[in-house]
A protein has these predicted regions:
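Short amphipathic alpha-helical segments at helix boundaries and their inter-helical linkers
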Residues: 64-68, 165-178, 211-219
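Pocket-lining segment of extracytoplasmic ligand-binding domains
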Residues: 58-147
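A conserved helix-loop-strand patch within extracytoplasmic ligand-binding domains
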Residues: 1-61, 65-67, 75-83, 106-111
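Short coil/loop linkers at secondary-structure junctions
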Residues: 40, 45-47, 87, 147-153, ...
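Secondary-structure end/capping motifs
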Residues: 112-196
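Extracytoplasmic/periplasmic, Sec-exported soluble proteins
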Residues: 10, 23-30, 51, 55, ...
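Conserved C-terminal helix/tail region of periplasmic/extracytoplasmic solute-binding proteins
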Residues: 183-225
Length: 225
């Protein structure tokens, strides 16, 4: 029944279908954050479902044995799950967008911000190269997985590159509020009781868009924040 309804954004489900379901995944992680975003998308909260705290391998094992209704997975296992007939319920970028954040120490920010801007320039140049060349992106993503001990087939890596590109060009980054997802994550952790409100405010106070703005100005990219 859950797969019977898909909206214009490609997201499966409805409030009536999801309410009361058992969802398995690790608490306090992006998977948990994503599930909350998915529920909020349909006007629900985590209290409307039975969320079971389980690590990815245990959740997947239980799911394969027939337990639960929805299971959280992480790359590169998402591709393999699709090959087994499992269905992704929606694009994370639609229900709970999350962008990685680059951070630096307060010392280098205060004393050598020009070096940070140069670093940002290199990062976005690499990302734009990856966005232009799927094979290049897959090659380096595969190297990353190998380095951290993940086993991923070439097909799984390419699927992630082609269907779940989490990279932004500099022009795209100029339109995304700097630190927004970081602050949202802090609020999420606060709601779980993992950090205090004062720590969330500290995160908010440490968001500094000025260096990215400077890079955009130097690169002739319009700043739209």
């Amino acid at each position: 029944p859950l797969l019977a309804q898909q909206d214009e954004n490609g997201v499966y489900g409805s409030a009536d279908l999801i309410r009361g379901m058992t969802i398995m995944g690790p608490s306090g992680t992006y998977a948990h954050y994503l599930i909350i975003g998915y529920l909020n998308y349909f006007g629900l909260t985590i209290d409307d479902v039975n969320y079971v705290n389980m690590e990815y391998p245990q959740a997947m094992q239980a799911f394969e044995l027939g337990d639960g209704d929805i299971c959280c997975m992480q790359n590169p296992n998402v591709y393999d799950a699709k090959q087994q007939g499992y269905v992704s319920l929606g694009d994370p970028a639609v229900v709970a967008p999350m962008y990685e954040n680059l951070v630096c120490s307060g010392k280098i920010y205060a004393e050598d911000s020009d070096t940070v801007v140069k670093f940002l320039k290199v990062v976005y140049r690499a990302q734009e190269d990856f966005l232009k060349d799927d094979k290049l992106a897959a090659e380096w993503l595969g190297k990353y997985y190998e380095k951290v001990g993940y086993q991923a087939s070439e097909k799984a890596v390419m699927d992630e590159v082609q269907n779940q590109k989490p990279l932004l060009s500099l022009a795209e980054a100029a339109q995304v509020p700097v630190g927004e997802s970081l602050v949202d994550t802090a609020k999420f952790m606060q709601d779980l009781g993992l950090i205090e409100e004062s720590q969330t405010k500290q995160v908010e106070g440490n968001v500094c868009p000025d260096l990215l703005k400077k890079l955009c100005e130097e690169s002739g990219v319009e700043w739209k924040q």
